[in-house]
Amino acid sequence: MQTPKKINLNLAWLGAAVLGLFGCASPPVPPVEAAPLAQACPAGVPEGARCLRGQDSASAHYLIVMPAQWSGVLVVHAHGGPTLGPPSTNRADEDIKRWVITVSEGHAWAGSVFRQGGFAVTTAAEDTERVRRIFVDHVAKPRRTLLHGQSWGAMVATRAAEMYPKSWEGVLLTSGVVAGPATYDFRLDMRALYQHLCNNHPRPDEPGYSLAIGLPKDSKLTAAELAARANDCLGVGKPAAQRTPEQARRLKTIVDVLKFPETSVMSHLNWGTFALGDVVEKNGGVSPLGNGGVRYVGTSDDAGLNAAIPRFKADPQAVARFAADVDHQGRFAVPVVSVHAINDATVFVEGQDTLRQRMTAAGHGGRLVQAFVDSREHSYWGDAHYPVLFEALLSWVEKGQKPTPAGIAQRCQQLQVARGAPAVGCAFVPDYAPQPLATRVFPR
């Protein structure tokens, strides 16, 4: 008969053995994905290309385009946005129309629509990895696999690069949201400053709410109605000559304080209303954004502004949940080329400084090359700029030839001339270096 001491020792040993087995257990095997089906290609896809469509095991729709003369390179694309509401199967068609240059260069293209609408970065990263596996399992085995994230899709791509480090051999980020949640702080600043100046979102006769939630879940406000309110207060829908002096003054205050052009006011106000509402809904009804302690500058009476502007406190748990879903640590195991327009008013170029700092702090600074374009465009800078970026990243991956901003600029011009196009189509600025994000977005 065993003594209690021996029984306890045996139980402890058994528990340790079970824990050891669980510790050594393999990660769950992903579900088997159905093969995609051949479908007609969207308009604009190069002649001879083959298009495949399907819906993955998590219900995300996707599109795969295989060029007639395949380079052996697969580019998995993470699209921008995010688009609020249910995902549209046509989203991938829109993406390939914009990024058909990828296929024209001979590379296969695969893009997921993402199964969740709105701000769901981790699940979008999972969908991105899933479409890569579908390509490998059912279409072809690429010699190289690159991950391309555009705009908000760069947030998805950085997440996917850290979640699935063995899936990618290089990462290209264009116009990317690469500074994490801090990228969006100024959208709450926009809401607070707008309400201070206009007091019509919400109106005094409407139920009040914390602006940090974007919009109450039961609100019926539409984008058109919001635009009408902004036009009443700021004259954003009118030529400058038709604005009242008071409208012009308010609009100038927003531009001076928040440091973006008047043409971007509505997009940022929309984000701070509808997209922020989606963020809050996905974070349990509380907001990860706040402006307590922010010191606003840029007016003739900054003290008066800071005393009067509405203030809101971020919920700590929402902050943690939001960061866990959308943020990266700069721990990328492969070469990263990140490119941004200097005057991008949608996603500020200063976020690139945060990317550099994070990768350096993580010990991966040597895996980053950044290039900058003399443009104010966010979505697409013109065909001249992208072939050289794919070429530079592939040369780095395959030959160990790390590109330089100057080399990218020079090679862009060479490729343009070789194609019989004017070299002036290239707008890279080799010696540009972005300032810290805190010089553009008020720190908190």
Where are these regions (language model features)?
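Accessory cap/linker subdomain of secreted extracellular hydrolases
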Residues: 30-42, 177-327
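Conserved alpha/beta-hydrolase "acid-adjacent" motif
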Residues: 346-351
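Gly/Ser-rich "nucleophile elbow"/oxyanion-hole loop immediately N-terminal to the catalytic nucleophile
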Residues: 69-70, 131-151, 167
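Alpha/beta-hydrolase-fold serine-hydrolase catalytic core, especially in secreted/extracellular enzymes
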Residues: 46, 231-274, 278-291, 333-334, ...
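Short beta-strand element of the alpha/beta-hydrolase
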Residues: 72-81
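Short beta-strand/loop motif that positions the catalytic acidic residue
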Residues: 338-340
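Primarily recognizes the serine-hydrolase "nucleophile elbow" in alpha/beta-hydrolase
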Residues: 144-199
